[in-house]
């Protein structure tokens, strides 16, 4: 049986909020089977819990934010959720003492490290996968995203930026998902932004914590970060990382092919909502044997399972 996973013990990290610029403390804790991922704002009195569900995503400008019916929000969840998805964590309680998850280095890598430090614990209930039975597609102008049947989880993603540095890099990636491929090839890709946008963002109280410590920054012609890029195709890989996180609010690992052109947080969430609304387009499945599971969540680097 392929079992659900949580973390072995609580872990904490401190960073800054990308948009607020304020210090944020994040704690990740074990949770019982079938809990899913629940985020908790501990700076509220009493603390406010928001389950990570597609319908709770009510803001997708510059990041993905969960917002409850009272308007209480937790923003910038996508990089943390990419790490949870990448390591196959089904159940966790995540406490944060601010309205946003810390940005760390702008990638999912610090969250992968944090989860590996906590240890990964297999639980007593079967892991449920969301299997795509027929294609579901959403469009917005020339942008589109689609999920269709596939035996594992494949990503086929293309971006199209006119910027010379991005245009010179590979802007199209096809990959079959596994935990090891995610950790090695995707998790270190950082968010990126343009100098020309920063003034506007800051005037709107956004990106106040943004810097070359947590983003790839470009002027009109080139990357300004002294150390350059982590991957030659870091731009498209970061968009894939974002999509992994955005799709994980479906509540389960997806079995299917995700194909996207120029998509972002808004369209990713629209796709998840469209999928879940069409109940004949998917089913939840479990696997008796490791060999039968079409997606490998084997953690690289010899992480010990409890």
From Swiss-Prot:
Which reaction is the catalytic activity of this chain?
a UDP-3-O-[(3R)-3-hydroxyacyl]-N-acetyl-alpha-D-glucosamine + H2O = a UDP-3-O-[(3R)-3-hydroxyacyl]-alpha-D-glucosamine + acetate
Record-linked Pfam families:
LpxC (PF03331)
Q: InterPro entries of this UniProt entry?
A: Ribosomal_Su5_D2-typ_SF, UDP-acyl_GlcNac_deAcase, UDP-acyl_GlcNac_deAcase_C, UDP-acyl_N-AcGlcN_deAcase_N
Which BP terms does GO give this entry?
lipid A biosynthetic process
State which pathway it belongs to. Glycolipid biosynthesis; lipid IV(A) biosynthesis; lipid IV(A) from (3R)-3-hydroxytetradecanoyl-[acyl-carrier-protein] and UDP-N-acetyl-alpha-D-glucosamine: step 2/6
What are the record's GO terms for cellular component? membrane
Q: List, separated by semicolons, the cofactors it needs.
A: Zn(2+)
Which keywords are on file for this protein? Answer: Hydrolase, Lipid A biosynthesis, Lipid biosynthesis, Lipid metabolism, Metal-binding, Zinc
| This protein's record includes keyword Lipid biosynthesis | yes
**Residues annotated to bind Zn(2+):** 79, 238, 242
GO terms (molecular function) for this protein are: metal ion binding; UDP-3-O-acyl-N-acetylglucosamine deacetylase activity
- Please indicate if the UniProt record lists Lipid metabolism as a keyword: yes
- Record family assignment: Belongs to the LpxC family.
| HAMAP family the UniProt entry points to | LpxC
Q: What is this protein called?
A: UDP-3-O-acyl-N-acetylglucosamine deacetylase
Name the species this protein comes from: Shewanella oneidensis (strain ATCC 700550 / JCM 31522 / CIP 106686 / LMG 19005 / NCIMB 14063 / MR-1)
What gene name is listed for this protein? lpxC
């Amino acid at each position: 049986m392929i079992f659900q996973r949580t973390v072995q013990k609580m872990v904490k990290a401190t960073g800054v909020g990308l948009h607020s610029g304020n210090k944020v403390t994040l704690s990740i804790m074990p949770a019982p089977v079938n809990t899913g991922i629940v985020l908790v704002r501990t700076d509220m009195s009493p603390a406010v819990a928001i389950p990570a569900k597609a319908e709770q995503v009510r803001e997708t400008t510059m990041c993905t934010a969960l917002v409850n019916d009272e308007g209480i929000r937790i923003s910038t969840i996508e990089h943390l959720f990419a790490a949870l998805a990448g390591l196959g964590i089904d159940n966790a309680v995540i406490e944060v003492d601010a309205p946003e998850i810390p940005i760390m280095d702008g990638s999912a890598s610090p969250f992968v490290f944090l989860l590996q430090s906590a240890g990964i614990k297999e639980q007593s209930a079967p892991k449920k996968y969301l299997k795509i039975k027929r294609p579901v597609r959403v469009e917005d102008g020339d942008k589109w995203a689609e999920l269709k049947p596939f035996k594992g989880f494949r990503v086929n993603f293309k971006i199209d930026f006119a910027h010379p540095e991005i245009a010179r890099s590979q802007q199209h990636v096809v990959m079959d998902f596994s935990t090891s491929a995610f950790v090695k090839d995707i998790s270190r890709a950082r968010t990126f932004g343009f100098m020309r946008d920063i003034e506007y963002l800051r005037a709107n109280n956004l990106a106040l914590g943004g810097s070359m410590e947590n983003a790839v920054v470009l002027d009109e012609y080139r990357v300004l970060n002294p150390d350059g890029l982590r991957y030659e195709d870091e731009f498209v890989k970061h968009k894939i990382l974002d999509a992994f996180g955005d799709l994980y609010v479906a509540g389960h690992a997806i079995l299917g092919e995700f194909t996207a052109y120029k998509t972002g947080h808004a369209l990713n969430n629209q796709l998840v909502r469209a999928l879940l609304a069409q109940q004949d387009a998917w089913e939840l499945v479990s696997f008796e044997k490791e060999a039968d599971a079409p997606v490998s969540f084997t953690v690289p680097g010899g992480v010990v399972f409890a």
